[in-house]
Amino acid sequence: MSADAAAGEPLPRLCCLEKGPNGYGFHLHGEKGKVGQFIRLVEPGSPAEKSGLLAGDRLVEVNGENVEKETHQQVVSRIRAALNAVRLLVVDPETDEQLKKLGVPIREELLRAQEKSEHTEPPAAADTKKAGDQNEAEKSHLERCELRPRLCTMKKGPNGYGFNLHSDKSKPGQFIRAVDPDSPAEASGLRAQDRIVEVNGVCMEGKQHGDVVSAIKAGGDEAKLLVVDKETDEFFKKCRVTPSQEHLDGPLPEPFSNGEIQKENSREALVEPASESPRPALARSASSDTSEELNAQDSPKRHDSTEPSSTSSSSDPILDFNISLAVAKERAHQKRSSKRAPQMDWSKKNELFSNL
């Protein structure tokens, strides 16, 4: 039972489960004389146990959908349809009985309503802010409940693993193009459009298609693929973190806010020195963002009026950063010319050849 229920406010519990190598780790069954589906057994150390699911709990909702009047098979189908993560709203027998006596329908909204009432209570301002921070953290946790990488472990069958790998020209990485029905890949939870992060514990970030295929083949008849779906991939990119096996059940990173990203970029811009040599400047502008490219297009108009001088001691780094190709070649030519040895006087040449 939750702390609130013990304090006299009976509430259901929301359990977020991530499927492990052996499934979720709980058994569902119906009881004679009772309506609904119940948790019969929770395996030790399983995702179900970690989520707080208890034997004897009655299942009320699956991913926000009420299942109280559904058959055993219908509930099982809903859980399977969620693939590798599921959200279960449950009540223990005591809480269930209390809510029935009060005539309160059991819904996930009960938890949200309780959080709101705690947040709007009129104790001291510091306590209110603390409750608000906890509420925000819990909400953020629920939103990120399914945004984790997945470890898909599979053994090769008679027809292989049963998935196709491909690369997408529009984005880096290797992706799952298709998963064969009833294949080891499907049984492991692998899905089409998943991006491969690790193969058998080795990071595949930045690797070519052939490297990933070789890494899978090197595993023999078994492969462990750490993958992310599209939403999870975008979440980790916002956090500027590469997904790893630590994120399977460990703490998740926090996304960067726009202000933090802008601050980070501006700091990098101040720290990075501008090269005075033409080649590095041009190479850097080729990988710059759109605004720098627009500045580079305007730069010839600014430089046409003033001819570059080889005797100038130093030039503005910003102007060097945006110089045109023609100006860069001219400066390079002048720099080479300035390093040539001075011409020898003709009389000295004549004297030298006479001595020889």
Swiss-Prot record:
Put simply, this protein is called Na(+)/H(+) exchange regulatory cofactor NHE-RF1
Subunit info here reads: Homodimer, and heterodimer with NHERF2. Binds the N-termini of EZR, RDX and MSN. Binds the C-termini of PDGFRA, PDGFRB, ADRB2, NOS2 and CFTR. Binds ARHGAP17, EPI64, RACK1, OPRK1, GNAQ, CTNNB1 and PLCB3. Binds PDZK1. Interacts with CLCN3. Binds the C-terminus of PAG1. In resting T-cells, part of a PAG1-NHERF1-MSN complex which is disrupted upon TCR activation. Forms a complex with CFTR and SLC4A7. Forms a complex with SLC4A7 and ATP6V1B1. Interacts with TRPC4 (via the PDZ-binding domain). Directly interacts with HTR4.
SS bonds (residue pairs): none
One Gene Ontology term of the molecular function aspect:
signaling receptor binding
The domain of life is Eukaryota
Cellular component (GO) terms are:
apical part of cell; apical plasma membrane; brush border membrane; cell periphery; cytoplasm; endomembrane system; extracellular region; filopodium
Which parts of the sequence carry Phosphoserine? 2, 46, 266, 277, 287-288, 291, 299
Sites of N-acetylserine modification: 2
Kindly state which keywords UniProt assigns to this record, in alphabetical order.
Acetylation, Cell membrane, Cell projection, Cytoplasm, Membrane, Phosphoprotein, Repeat, Wnt signaling pathway
Residue positions, PTM Phosphothreonine: 290
The membrane topology noted for this protein in its Swiss-Prot or TrEMBL record is: Peripheral membrane protein
What ranges does the record list as Low complexity composition bias?
Answer: 272-288, 307-317
